[in-house]
Amino acid sequence: LSVSAKEKEYILFLSSVNAEEAWIHGFRNELQKRFPYEGNIELHEYFLAVPVLTNAEEVKQAQDNLLQTFPTPPKVVIIVGDPGWLVSAPIFDGPWKNIPVILCYSRGRVPSTLQTLLAKTPLTEANSIPIEEFNKNYNITVLKQPYYIKETLTLIKQLQPEVNRIAFISDNRYIST
């Protein structure tokens, strides 16, 4: 970033994964259309790549890298995916306290510990907490992406009545389900 870019106000697009995810690419492009670089406020992006983080030291390094890349706090942070929020939340306890956060694509429950997140353990009542509980001390708005399972199955049945079996395929990542 140039000196002038660092001095300009900006919104930070913070992704849990990488730019190669098709829907993240589309979402990012839509945001970029609305924040042209010659405007009064810029849109910057950062990709945490949470799926490759394996321990607390790597998480701390990711947090430090984020703060080093953006030493001036953003006006707002848009976070895609609750794993990115869980990894970056400690920054909002300190240097970025009270910075507004918009969290997109969050689950109703999140890992109760960093270790649960990093272990990629399936969430249960015992190892997770409601997202509202995790968020209670932050200036955050959560945009939930509902599942329309019943509606989707009904639509499939209407469009293709000959279909008798459907395979549900997932790689156990919320964003890819």
PLM regions: where:
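Short hydrophobic alpha-helices and adjacent helix-cap/hinge residues
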Residues: 2-177
